[in-house]
Structure formats: structure tokens, C-alpha cells
From Swiss-Prot:
PANTHER family: NUCLEOLAR COMPLEX PROTEIN 4, NUCLEOLAR COMPLEX PROTEIN 4 HOMOLOG
Entry protein name: Nucleolar complex protein 4
Cellular location(s): Nucleus, Nucleolus
InterPro entries: CCAAT-binding_factor, Noc4
Keyword Ribonucleoprotein: yes
Chief site of localization: nucleus
An example Gene Ontology CC term for this record: nucleus
Organism in which the protein naturally occurs: Saccharomyces cerevisiae (strain ATCC 204508 / S288c) (Baker's yeast)
Keywords (A to Z) from UniProt: Nucleus, Ribonucleoprotein, Ribosome biogenesis, rRNA processing
Function: Involved in nucleolar processing of pre-18S ribosomal RNA and ribosome assembly. Has a role in the nuclear export of 40S pre-ribosomal subunit to the cytoplasm. Its subcellular location and association with pre-40S subunit are unaffected by RPS19 disruptions, suggesting it acts before the ribosomal protein.
Amino acid sequence: MVLLISEIKDIAKRLTAAGDRKQYNSIIKLINELVIPENVTQLEEDETEKNLRFLVMSLFQIFRKLFSRGDLTLPSSKKSTLEKEQFVNWCRKVYEAFKTKLLAIISDIPFETSLGLDSLDVYLQLAELESTHFASEKGAPFFPNKTFRKLIIALWSSNMGEIEDVKSSGASENLIIVEFTEKYYTKFADIQYYFQSEFNQLLEDPAYQDLLLKNVGKWLALVNHDKHCSSVDADLEIFVPNPPQAIENESKFKSNFEKNWLSLLNGQLSLQQYKSILLILHKRIIPHFHTPTKLMDFLTDSYNLQSSNKNAGVVPILALNGLFELMKRFNLEYPNFYMKLYQIINPDLMHVKYRARFFRLMDVFLSSTHLSAHLVASFIKKLARLTLESPPSAIVTVIPFIYNLIRKHPNCMIMLHNPAFISNPFQTPDQVANLKTLKENYVDPFDVHESDPELTHALDSSLWELASLMEHYHPNVATLAKIFAQPFKKLSYNMEDFLDWNYDSLLNAESSRKLKTLPTLEFEAFTNVFDNEDGDSEASSQGNVYLPGVAW
């Protein structure tokens, strides 16, 4: 950059103060100065960024003045002259050159800089001016959608401070995207409407389709919020002074939003993005779809992912929320749903952070009294078996869950109290001998490898695992498990009291517990643990050494 701030200020002052068109050629000189030096990793090292930011703001002031003078507005055909039209067209070409420079800054700078944020703000302020001065006639509704479309391309081309998929959500941390989302997209209804509309058209353009589909992280950063213009409680403003009435068409917005989502869901998603989408799908995606049933294929594929990909992890668990929403609201019929739900229950489930989410949903799915006792018994038995190798924080969730299931499905009580194995004082010697033989030869009939919960023989089994838990090393688990050795007087447990327990909360509860009586302790006080290195056993002889005869 050759021009100094003082020179830029002088040129800008002459251009904005006077209406002399001879000075307008200086605009081209200023635009040509708006160039980012090559092979630069940051602009803060010198005055370059400061000068470029000042140049951008000066050019914005100049073009705002040109808008107010009407130099960028084509005159009506009656008042038009050839000279006037040529001048306006020349001004517009210079104006387009400035916008192109701004877009280049937004899309090409690979490092975080305030210049990019300034360029974004200036570009959108220019779009606001266009909505007033580029309308077909004064006061006519207008939104500069072509200008906006170019901005979308620049945003999706930007890699400013890009740390794609590093966040646990899989969303982009691109500074430009974050700024655009927080400052514009989540605040203005017209920007949301035209963004979805133009994005949809770009997805249909082969020239830009690949660019958009590869940057799902930016899309997630943009739409992962509750302030969509189709939301009932969204309190959004209008960005341009007089937008077209089309922005009130909620159905069209939902249709575009839906098409964009479906296109991106068919693209390449990272595992983190997959999880993030499934986490928000039931609250932030389905309500804004015009036809939510179009998500059926995506959700069923996600739910079935476990059988085809052992590394899928929690994806089927997260897909449950969306599936349940479609089943509840749109009567989605899913074949073998309970078989798939049963297959999700495995040792890994007890260690994932979405365990509470899964148990909340499973509580709903297994609450129906129309379910067969064999099916419910399989879920009870499999959960009980998993407690033998689960952490205490998971076990304290499973125990009340099993208790509630047995209360809802009394036919499963036989797994706890089987009359065939109970002796009574009126039995004959032969009956006593037969009972003894029956107990000695007992083999648990439960087939843990069977994938169909109707065929596991769980109802013929017993919950001996719960008896093992009564002797668990953790006192909370042992105490809680003993509820099964008592009469079932409690109606049910409130599962919310148990779902969010972890090692930290268990330790905190134990350490903060107030004891009614202090435990009785007996101990001896020692001044040393070992004898001195020189073998001096004087202290040992006096009884002040814990390990006499051992030198350290």
C-alpha cells in the first residue's frame, strides 16, 4: 500500500465535499490501493491493517455520498439523457469494483483480522443502501438478492481462522461466519428469508454445489439457534427499509430451509456433525420443516447405523429423539422398532454422556401397557445384566428404572418372585427333594445373544443380578438395590432424580453427607514410618516407629 492515511483522508474529503465529477477518477485510485499483500500471515505487524481499514471506511463514505447524490441511480426514461446514463453506468462499474474488493477480503484472507469484519459490515450497509436506491421506483419494495448471493459465496469460500470440526458440535469457528450469524442472521427476518432462498438456488448451481456441500460446519454455525423467522416466539427486526412482502411467506421459508437441510444431509458429514445434527433435530430442525416426514430416511438410516458401523457409537441413541418426534406427530411406522431399541442396549451405553437422554426416551417407549411381558422382561433382564459391569453412576439409574418397569408391568414380577422356587412348610419330602434338585440344576435360560426381545426367554429367568448388587462395594448402590428385597409399596421413582448422576456427584454427595453419629476409630500415633537409615532403633524401641526394622 502506497497511500498514507493523510492522503486517503484528503482524497475522500475532496470527493465528498464537492460535486465535481472530475474528482471521481480518484475513486479508482483508492480502490486499486485496496490490495492485501501476498504471503502475509497477519496484518497486525505494521500499519497495513490500520491503513486498509481506514481505506475501506473512506470508500464507504464516498459511495454513500454518491448514493445520496443520485450518481448510482438510473434516471427515469423521461428525464434520461445519454450523458447521464453513461455517467451512472460508469459509477456503477466503479461501485461493483469496490464490492468485488470487499468480497475478496472476506473470502481470501486466511487469518483473523478486523479488516474482514469491517468489510462484512460495509458490504451489508451497501446492500441496505441498494435496497433504497436500486428499487424500480422510489419507495418500491426491494431487496438486493444478487448482491446478497455474492456475499454467501464469499462467506462459504472464507477460511479466516478456520478450525473446522474442532468444536464438539462440529460447527465452524470461522470468525466471519460467527460475526455474520450473531450480528445479522439471528436478528433480521429478511436476511434469513433471502439467505435460505439464495442458498437454495446456489445448491442447484453445479458451479457452487460442491463448495456448499463441503462446508456443513459453516451451515451448522449459522442455523443452530432458536431465532428462525418461522418461530412463533421469534422477535426479529427488518434489515432493509422496505423489504418485499415475500418475507412474510412462512411456508416458502420453511420450504427453502427444508430443501437446504436435505441437500446438506445427503453430503459428507463428519461424525461430530452427525451427532450435532441429531442433537438439535427434534427442536431446531423438525419444527421449521414444511414436510418433516422427509427426514424419515435420514433418521432411519441413522438408527440402523449401529448394525453396519461398529464405530457409530451414540448415533442411534441420538436418532431416537427425532424418530420419536415423527412417530408422535406424524404417525411414522418403524418396523422392528423395539428390536432396534433392544440392540442399542450394550455395555458402551453405560459410559456415554447421552445415557440420561436415552433412558428418558426408553421410559416413554416402554410405558405402554400393550407391550408383551416377554418384550419388557427382555429389557429388564438385559439392563440388569449390564449392571454387573457398569459404573455406580449408571447403576443408580438402572435400579429405579427396573423398579418402575416392574410396577408398570406386574407380569414381570415373576422374575423376582417365582413361586416354583419357594418352599413352604406344607411340602412333602418328595416336593422338598424336587425343589432342592430344581435349584441345584438351575441354569439361567436368558439368551443374551438373541437380538429379538420376544425370543430371549427373559421371563423364564430371574433377576439374580439385583441380588449381587445388594453386596455392591458402593454403599449407595447396595442400599438402593435392597428395595427389591422389600414389599413393593412405593408407586414409582422419579427418574429425574437419578438420570444425571456421575462419579463427581456421587463423591460430592458422600463427602457432604452429614453423619448423625461419628464413626468409632482407634489408632496409635507414630512419629516415624520407618527406622533411620543408620539402623538406629531407639525410636523403634520407644514405640514411635510404625515399621520397626525397615530403613528408608
